C-alpha cells in the first residue's frame, strides 16, 4: 500500500498536517472547488517561485492563503504589486464560481508569504528545479546525479528517490528512470517522508518528475 499511494496522503493526521484547514456542512463542495481554483492560479502564476506548500484556512467570511516559498520577493513583487495581482486573479475566479453556483456571500481574501529557508529539504522545490533543468534541455541523468549529490550532502535527509518518466532526451519510446540513495520506508507510517511532483513541458512532450525525501522517524512526545 505504501508504494501505491502518495506518502503525504497516507500520513495525514499522523505526522503530516492537512493542507486545507476548515470544515463546513453545506458549502463544503463549493469551497473545495474554490480551493482547487486557488491552487491552480498560484501554480500557474508562480511556476518558478520555488513553492514548497500552499495552505488554506477559512472562516465563513474570510479566506487566508499561506504560501511557503524560497523566493518570497518574487511573489510579493515591487511595492507589493505581484501579490496584489495574484490576489486579483483569485478574487476574479472565486467571484465567477460563486456567481455560477448562485452563492451571494461577501468574503475577504488574505495572502501571507512565508520564507522557506532550506530548499534542500523540500521535495516540491527540488522537483520544480529538475523540471526547469529538463525544460532547458539539460540531460536528465546529469540533472538527477547532480540533485542526488546535493541531497546526499545534507545530514538531515536519511534517504532520497528521484523518478522521471516520459520521452527522456527526446527518445522515441517513453520510459521511466529512477535514482535513489539511503533508505525509503514507504510502509512505515511514522517515517517522515516529503513528496513532490512536477511536470516538465518539452518539445517532445511532457516529462513527469517525482521526488521522495526521507527525513527519519517521528515519535510522539511523552507528557
Regions found by a protein language model. Give the residues of each.
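RNA-contacting regions in translation and RNA-metabolism proteins
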Residues: 1-223
Amino acid at each position: 500500500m505504501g508504494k501505491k499511494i502518495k506518502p503525504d496522503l497516507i500520513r495525514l493526521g499522523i505526522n503530516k498536517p492537512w493542507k486545507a484547514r476548515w470544515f463546513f456542512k453545506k458549502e463544503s463542495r463549493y469551497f473545495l472547488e474554490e480551493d482547487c481554483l486557488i491552487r491552480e492560479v498560484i501554480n500557474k502564476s508562480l511556476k518558478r517561485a520555488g513553492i514548497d506548500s500552499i495552505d488554506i484556512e477559512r472562516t465563513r467570511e474570510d479566506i487566508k492563503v499561506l504560501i511557503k516559498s524560497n523566493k518570497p520577493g518574487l511573489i510579493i513583487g515591487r511595492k507589493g504589486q505581484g501579490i496584489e495581482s495574484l490576489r486579483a486573479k483569485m478574487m476574479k475566479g472565486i467571484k465567477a464560481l460563486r456567481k455560477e453556483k448562485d452563492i451571494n456571500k461577501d468574503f475577504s481574501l488574505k495572502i501571507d508569504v512565508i520564507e522557506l529557508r532550506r530548499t534542500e529539504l523540500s521535495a516540491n522545490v527540488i522537483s520544480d528545479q529538475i523540471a526547469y533543468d529538463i525544460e532547458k534541455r539539460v540531460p536528465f541523468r546529469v540533472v538527477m546525479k547532480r540533485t542526488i549529490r546535493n541531497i546526499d550532502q545534507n545530514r538531515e535527509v536519511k534517504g532520497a528517490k528521484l523518478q522521471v518518466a516520459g520521452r527522456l532526451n527526446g527518445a522515441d519510446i517513453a520510459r521511466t528512470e529512477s535514482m535513489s540513495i539511503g533508505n525509503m520506508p514507504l510502509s512505515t507510517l511514522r517515517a517522515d517522508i516529503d513528496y513532490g511532483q512536477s511536470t516538465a513541458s518539452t518539445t517532445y512532450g511532457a516529462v513527469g518528475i517525482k521526488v521522495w525525501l526521507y527525513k527519519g522517524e517521528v515519535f510522539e512526545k511523552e507528557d
